[in-house]
UniProtKB/Swiss-Prot annotation:
One of its GO terms (cellular component) is cytoplasm. Signal peptide: none annotated. Disulfide bonds: none annotated. Component of the SKA complex, composed of ska1, ska2 and ska3. It comes from the Eukaryota. The gene is ska2. Component of the SKA complex, a microtubule plus end-binding complex of the outer kinetochore that stabilizes spindle microtubule-kinetochore attachments, promotes alignment of chromosomes at the mitotic spindle equator (chromosome congression) and assists suppression of the spindle assembly checkpoint. Kinetochores, consisting of a centromere-associated inner segment and a microtubule-contacting outer segment, play a crucial role in chromosome segregation by mediating the physical connection between centromeric DNA and spindle microtubules. Belongs to the SKA2 family. The keyword 4Fe-4S does not apply. It comes from Salmo salar. It holds the Pfam family SKA2. The lineage of its organism: Eukaryota, Metazoa, Chordata, Craniata, Vertebrata. One of its GO terms (biological process) is mitotic sister chromatid segregation. This is SKA complex subunit 2. It is found in: Cytoplasm, Cytoskeleton, Spindle; Chromosome, Centromere, Kinetochore. GO terms for molecular function: microtubule binding.
Length: 228
């Protein structure tokens, strides 16, 4: 997918260069061969105005391609981070419960190789350079103990989702949620008005970020439940 986006971006850049050259060549030929007092409908210079409009639209498309490439890279990084975490949790579960997992399927092996992960007979292994420190594991792996979101984990969340959320503010809000649900084991989901009533610094970006990190659960009404 990354290669396809790169090729598309290169094609747009080449097309832009070709149009630039064509415009300069046509402008020179028209200025040399067409009288200045020729009729407007017969004057090829009008074609250059249309070409300029086409170039403007083409430049806008190039910008969109670059934005798509950036978002695609962020999405791939986020997928790798979450897959790394899942693999580590599965390995920890296997070691703790002494359970033998099913053999990795051919499809799973191809997916792991595509993401740069090594595969043995039963599990997908995370390369050392991609392993997450213990403090970066999601809260669900820490047996109910509060663990702050790390800067690396936050940066793995797509910019379109986390917006301008600050790490300190996100952790402060997450801690408020954790303390509330820790003391109220059987309490229902929290509504937005209830959170504001409790002076929680809630925002849509914070909720989406924590949901993306699988730390909270949001229902259709926007009610929040902590995933302990």
């Amino acid at each position: 997918m990354e290669t396809a986006v790169d090729k598309l971006e290169a094609m747009f850049q080449k097309a832009e260069a070709d149009m630039e050259y064509m415009e300069k060549r046509l402008r020179l030929d028209f200025l040399t061969n067409v009288p200045e007092n020729s009729a407007a409908e017969e004057n090829p210079m009008k074609l250059l105005e249309n070409l300029s409009a086409i170039k403007t639209r083409h430049a806008a498309l190039c910008t969109q391609v670059q934005e798509i490439a950036a978002e695609q890279k962020q999405s791939m990084d986020a997928i790798r981070v979450h897959l790394d975490t899942t693999v580590q949790l599965v390995q920890q579960l296997q070691q703790t419960a002494d359970v033998e997992l099913p053999t990795v399927t051919e499809t799973e092996q191809e997916s792991a190789e595509f993401l740069g992960l090594s595969v043995n007979q039963n599990t997908i292994e995370v390369p050392m350079s991609m392993e997450l420190p213990a403090q970066e594991l999601p809260q669900s792996s820490r047996e109910g103990e509060f663990e702050e979101v790390s800067e690396a984990t936050l940066e793995a969340v797509p910019c379109s989702m986390r917006a301008n959320v600050k790490l300190a503010n996100l952790n402060a809000f997450y801690k408020q949620l954790h303390e509330y649900f820790s003391f109220r084991k059987n309490s229902g989901a929290l509504s937005l008005p209830k959170m504001k009533q409790m002076n929680m610094k809630v925002s849509d970006a914070k909720l989406k970020t924590l949901q993306h990190l699988s730390l909270i659960e949001l229902d259709m009404k926007g009610h929040v439940r902590l995933l302990l």
